[in-house]
């Protein structure tokens, strides 16, 4: 790959906490010239990160990667309307930012596809206009991901969502899936595309036990169930509220839920906990750097991971 020039399209990028930042740094370390077309950092809270606003900065560099930022409507408040506007605004503004890349000839386009699938639009348009191959790493499969957070039962709307989503996937020369099961689904959607499976990775630090005496002392004497990650509608965290209700009814105070992280559904989850009067069964630790997480995993008696069906 040395000497290749790659255009990466991803709505989210550094300083937001997404794996694409590491992937691009890896491309650059391998000798590629990497440009990223992305949005402005405001995920997950919907507030601009320090040093950013709608007007920019629109051009930066980080870890050997050149960053071109397009405007987007921030997710402020994480209401359904604001999330919808955020979803729509990035692909539109990014499309109009493609002329900024004029004269920067690329050998390939790489799209890091998170929600929504519409964020692929600038990648598809650039790849077709300039006749360069498009590779899409599918993180959120649409429309299935949409249905996991928004129950759409109208058959006509489901048909439209499926048609639009599948159209985007079929525009890629290569699709990268996170698992064999997802690869099988993509094979049915886009049979002509080349496909490969690249599982999500984690840092080596997660394999180590890290004992933090102060942390372990805070949660001593209880069975601690730890969730560490993104608090979003796709994660079935309300299930823990139901568990807490049952524990309360049984007068069981020896089980405790520790939530490490942040996300668009945190406020709603805290409100549900308050409404159920089970706040004593929960501790919210907020966002932590990845280097802190092994200590929480070591302290935990059980880890929680669940997705909405």
Task: List each model region and its residues.
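Acidic anion/phosphate-binding donor-loop and adjacent secondary structure
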Residues: 187, 201-217, 221, 236
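Carbohydrate-associated surface elements
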Residues: 40, 181, 198-201, 287
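Nucleotide-activated donor-binding/catalytic signature segment of Leloir-type glycosyltransferases, i.e.
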Residues: 260, 267-294, 302
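An aromatic- and histidine-rich active-site surface loop
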Residues: 17, 83-98, 108-139, 143-145
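Membrane-proximal helix-turn-helix segments that form the acceptor-binding/catalytic region
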Residues: 118, 125-130, 155-175
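Conserved donor-binding/catalytic core segment of Leloir-type glycosyltransferases
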Residues: 214-235, 240-245, 258
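Acidic donor-binding loop of glycosyltransferase active sites
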Residues: 173, 297-309
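N-terminal subdomain of nucleotide-sugar transferases
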Residues: 1-60
């Amino acid at each position: 790959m040395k000497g290749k020039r790659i255009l990466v399209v991803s709505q989210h990028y550094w300083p937001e906490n997404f794996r694409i930042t590491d992937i691009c740094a890896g491309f650059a370390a391998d000798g590629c010239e990497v440009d990223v077309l992305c949005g402005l950092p405001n995920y997950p809270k919907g507030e601009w990160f320090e040093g950013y606003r709608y007007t920019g900065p629109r051009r930066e560099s980080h870890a050997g990667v050149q960053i071109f930022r397009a405007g987007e409507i921030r997710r402020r408040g994480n209401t359904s309307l604001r999330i919808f506007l955020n979803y729509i605004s990035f692909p539109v503004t990014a499309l109009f930012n493609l002329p900024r890349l004029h004269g920067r000839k690329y050998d390939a386009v790489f799209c890091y596809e998170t929600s929504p699938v519409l964020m692929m639009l600038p990648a598809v348009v650039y790849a077709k206009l300039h006749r360069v191959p498009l590779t899409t790493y599918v993180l959120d499969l649409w429309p299935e991901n949409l249905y996991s957070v928004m129950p759409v039962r109208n058959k006509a709307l489901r048909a439209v969502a499926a048609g639009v989503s599948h159209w985007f996937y079929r525009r890629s020369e290569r699709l990268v899936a996170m698992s064999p099961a997802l690869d099988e689904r993509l094979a049915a959607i886009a049979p002509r595309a080349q496909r490969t499976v690249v599982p999500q990775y984690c840092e080596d630090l997660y394999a180590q036990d890290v004992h933090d005496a102060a942390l372990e002392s805070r949660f001593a004497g209880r069975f601690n169930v730890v969730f560490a990650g993104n608090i979003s509608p796709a994660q079935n965290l309300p299930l823990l509220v139901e568990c807490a209700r049952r524990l309360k009814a049984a007068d069981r105070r020896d089980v405790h839920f520790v939530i490490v992280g942040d996300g668009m559904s945190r406020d709603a989850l805290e409100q549900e906990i308050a409404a159920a009067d089970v706040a004593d069964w929960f501790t919210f630790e907020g966002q932590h750097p990845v280097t802190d997480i092994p200590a929480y995993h070591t302290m935990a008696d059980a880890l929680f991971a669940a997705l909405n069906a």
